[in-house]
């Protein structure tokens, strides 16, 4: 739920499960950020919502994503389009979670390859953002974009930006 459906509630629950409190989880996040050498990032909110002391750069996010994609379980979640949860009494068929990336894409295909996965984001100050992974001409690319026009209720300009960049990569690397 934290990645596919972009659920802030899932992030808060995960933080409490891992560290006991959201504040303790933030301490872990900032410690890991330092260990990874993310010099322009500081986390002050586990959901990613706006907070004056919560900031990063596209470079740092790309470095973080690159490290995370090296973990098999994260790679699997990040590149999943839909996932159905285990059935419960309240939801006998489970709950289908869909990646927020794919609601903005008609096709995953781009020249020479395809978009494998991504995580969307939005705050008023950061605009529409996207961290994505594509494979083009047998090579993988990470792209992080920010400050795209629009909001959660408009066209996905952050996704359009990524598709355009990936198309150019595909055309130039044939």
Which residues does each PLM region occupy?
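Penicillin-recognizing serine hydrolase domain
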Residues: 20-174
């Amino acid at each position: 739920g934290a990645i596919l459906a972009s659920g802030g509630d899932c992030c808060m629950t995960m933080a409490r499960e891992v560290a006991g409190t959201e504040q303790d989880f933030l301490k872990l996040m900032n410690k890991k950020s330092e260990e990874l050498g993310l010099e322009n990032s500081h986390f002050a909110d586990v959901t990613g919502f706006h907070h004056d002391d919560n900031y990063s750069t596209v470079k740092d996010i790309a470095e973080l994503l690159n490290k995370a994609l090296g973990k098999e379980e994260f790679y699997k979640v990040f590149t999943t389009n839909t996932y159905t949860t285990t059935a419960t009494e309240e939801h006998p068929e489970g709950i289908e979670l869909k990646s927020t990336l794919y609601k903005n894409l008609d096709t995953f295909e781009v020249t020479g390859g395809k978009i494998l996965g991504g995580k969307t984001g939005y705050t008023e100050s950061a605009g529409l953002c996207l961290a994505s992974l594509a494979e083009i001409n047998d090579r993988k690319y990470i792209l992080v974009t920010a400050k795209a026009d629009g909001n959660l209720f408009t066209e996905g300009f952050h996704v359009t930006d990524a598709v355009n960049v990936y198309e150019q990569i595909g055309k130039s690397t044939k």
